[in-house]
Amino acid sequence: MKRLLILFTALLFLLAALPALAAPAQLTWYGHAAFKVVTPNGKVLLVDPWISNPSNPNAEKDLAALTKVDLIFLTHGHGDHIGDAVEIAKKTGAKLVATFDLQKAMVAYKGFPAKQAERAETGSFGGTISLLDGEVTVLFVPAIHGASMDTPNGPVYAGEPGGFLISVKNGPRIYHTGDTDLFSDMALLKGQVDLMLLCIGDKFTMGPVRAAQAVDMIRPKKAIPMHFGTFPALSGTPEEFKKALRRYGLEFLMYQMKVGETLTWK
């Protein structure tokens, strides 16, 4: 009996010494191009955090709930992608991940805290950076779009538009296209993407047909449409996107998130 007690006690100490099992990564869509990624270790990333966009009925509640954010990613300097970034950064201390020129413009023209926009979190297209002690790796990729930043004195240069391939340790590889048209170098990401978050709204970005062609080039595990329906001009629809995917036999790849939905990656 005494021997069993000793073995049981030793087992308890061993279990206590083991690291806690990490939770699965999660992806939340706030509408438009705004997403939250939670890593298995609980780090919080926001991409193009316009939480208060018109398609989000719970914007006020969602903003209030963002009390812990580690990194804010911005694809370019347009207002519908900067969104609530400055407010969230000031509240949470989140650091800005963006190209060098966009970082500087955010500090100079939008009041983003300079101490939270440092060289460790910046790069340029083709460059890769490791963040959060290796928990997140980021590849900066180009996009085809405008990228000026609005100020009281008119638009200013804020770097070139882009996207991100965000690789989460023990989690998904997420390609956020930013605002873009289809371009041939997308094919270089083939086989490297689990979740593709891609614009389908048309007029200012690729529409459903060209977005489907982008999916055919990359072949992600899931294709999640975004940047549609926020304004009347963004007329592309998920239904049209799915129809266009059907031409390639890829309609099964589409996953349509609802605003406020959280997808768990297993």
Curated annotation (Swiss-Prot):
Citing just one GO molecular function, the answer is: hydrolase activity
State the superkingdom: Bacteria
Q: Which UniProt keywords apply?
A: Hydrolase
Task: Mention any Pfam family matching this sequence.
Answer: Lactamase_B_2
Q: HAMAP family, alphabetically?
A: UPF0173
* Family affiliation: Belongs to the UPF0173 family.
Q: What is the protein name for this chain?
A: UPF0173 metal-dependent hydrolase Glov_0171
Top-down, what is the taxonomic lineage of the species of origin? Bacteria, Pseudomonadati, Thermodesulfobacteriota, Desulfuromonadia, Geobacterales
